[in-house]
C-alpha cells in the first residue's frame, strides 16, 4: 500500500517537473525572440508574443495547481517536499519573466531605439541563467546552479555599463527600460536558484553567507 502511494507521488512529481522544464525552455526561447523583435523593430513578432503571453502562462497556473494538490493529498516530506516547493517557485518566477517579456515586446511596437550590443548580451545571459537553472532542477546539479548564479553578476555588469553610457534617460528612449526588464528577469531566475539550492543542499542559501561560499565560487 505505502509503496503504491510512494510510486504515485514519484510519478506525479516527475510529470510536473517535466512540464516545468518544458515551460522553462519555452520561456528561454521567448527571451531570445522578444529581444530580437525589439532590436529589429519586428512588430509582427512582437504582437504575436504579446498575444500568446496569457496562453503560455496558463502552464504556470497548471503547475502550481498540481503542486498544491500533491502537497495536500500526499503531504510529502524531505526531498519530495523540497522538490514540489522548487517546482512551484520556478513556475511562478517563469510566469513573471514572461510578463516582463510582454513589456519588451510592447517597446518593439512603440518604436525602435539605437541598440548597443549590451542588450543582446543581456538577453543571452538571461537565457543561459534559465537553462542552467532548469538543468540544475532536473538533475540536482550544483555546478549548473553555480553557473546560473555567477551569470547574474555578468548581467549586472552589463546593465551597469549600459547605464553609465546612457545617463540621460530622456535620450535613451525605451533602451534602459528594456535593460531593466532583462535585469529583473535575472532577479526572478535567482529566485528559482534560491529554491533549487534548497532542494539540492537542504539549506536556504541565496540570502545567507553560505550562498557566497558555496554558489558564487
Swiss-Prot record:
This is Phosphate-specific transport system accessory protein PhoU homolog 2. One of its GO terms (cellular component) is cytoplasm. Its main location: cytoplasm. InterPro entries: P_transport_PhoU (IPR028366), PhoU-like_sf (IPR038078), PhoU_dom (IPR026022). Homodimer. One of its GO terms (molecular function) is protein homodimerization activity. It is found in: Cytoplasm. Plays a role in the regulation of phosphate uptake. It comes from the Archaea. SUPFAM superfamilies: PhoU-like. Belongs to the PhoU family. Keywords: Cytoplasm, Phosphate transport, Transport. Signal peptide: none annotated. Gene3D superfamilies: Phosphate transport system protein phou homolog 2, domain 2. It holds the Pfam family PhoU. One of its GO terms (biological process) is negative regulation of phosphate transmembrane transport.
